Amino acid sequence: MLAELNAEVLENTYISGNLYRLTLRIPDKILKQIEPGHFAMIKPSDTYDPMGRRAFAVADIEEHKAVFYYDVYGKGTYLLSKRKPGERLKTFLPLGKRLFSYEGDKHLLIGGGVGLAGLTLLAKKLRDMGKKVFIAYGGRSREHLGMVEWLEKEEFPYELFTNDGSAGRKGFVTEILKEFSTDWVVHACGPKPMLKTIKEMKTGHKVYFSLEERMACGWGVCLGCVVKTRDGKFKRVCYEGPVMPMEEVIL
């Protein structure tokens, strides 16, 4: 059941680079409905400038709380970064129809930048199911790997990649694919060039993309988040996604 809330801000903390962590108070009856892949549409300010909401993956769930990570890259997220604990944000969740597959016993999660936030709830779910999980996390530099603290707290096996070599291995996070056999199911979330590279590598893995597109509504009405599919049609990321098999989409 979708819910529209005036959710209380519990935390809105700068992490590093452009990354912030936002924690909202959410009723437990709503939290119980949230599955990996679900997202929320959050209005960053109480004004009409900007008018629209912004889409954020639900990165973690705690008692009475939902956690989100976001990069500040425009007016909306800048205004969001200024919101203080105790203030309230118009929040619509849980959104997303097509969610992650749990098939297979071994799962490689590839997160690029803030895209890792789209995979963290999945990682915990798979672990709870007794699945083997490995996380590869990449960014431009050390300061763009702000979710390392989460990885360490949750004690997942992981490897870091940075373009400039300032943390972890120097290179692109997609290189990790060459080191895992094809019986590992791959889940990836991050910038479109990263996803495109994974698709072009043709490693033979079963791959699922959690897609990130700009959204105005979040429930399939505005058609602002469509992606082209191999059958020549278009699918709405918010409604026929956000998770789609790699072979379905054209990037």
From Swiss-Prot:
Organism: Aquifex aeolicus (strain VF5)
Binding positions ([2Fe-2S] cluster): 217, 222, 225, 238
Family classification: Belongs to the PyrK family.
BP-aspect Gene Ontology terms: pyrimidine nucleotide biosynthetic process
Lineage: Bacteria, Pseudomonadati, Aquificota, Aquificia, Aquificales
PROSITE patterns on file: FAD_FR
SUPFAM superfamilies hit by this protein: Ferredoxin reductase-like, C-terminal NADP-linked domain, Riboflavin synthase domain-like
The keyword Plastid is assigned to this record: no
Cofactor requirements of the protein: [2Fe-2S] cluster; FAD
Cofactor binding: number and manner: Binds 1 [2Fe-2S] cluster per subunit.
Chain ranges of the FAD-binding FR-type domain: 2-101
Protein name: Dihydroorotate dehydrogenase B (NAD(+)), electron transfer subunit homolog
Keyword Iron-sulfur: yes
CDD domains per the UniProt record, alphabetical: DHOD_e_trans
Keywords: 2Fe-2S, Electron transport, FAD, Flavoprotein, Iron, Iron-sulfur, Metal-binding, Transport
PANTHER family from the UniProt entry: DIHYDROOROTATE DEHYDROGENASE B (NAD(+)), ELECTRON TRANSFER SUBUNIT (PTHR43513), DIHYDROOROTATE DEHYDROGENASE B (NAD(+)), ELECTRON TRANSFER SUBUNIT-RELATED (PTHR43513:SF3)
Gene Ontology MF term list: 2 iron, 2 sulfur cluster binding; flavin adenine dinucleotide binding; metal ion binding; oxidoreductase activity
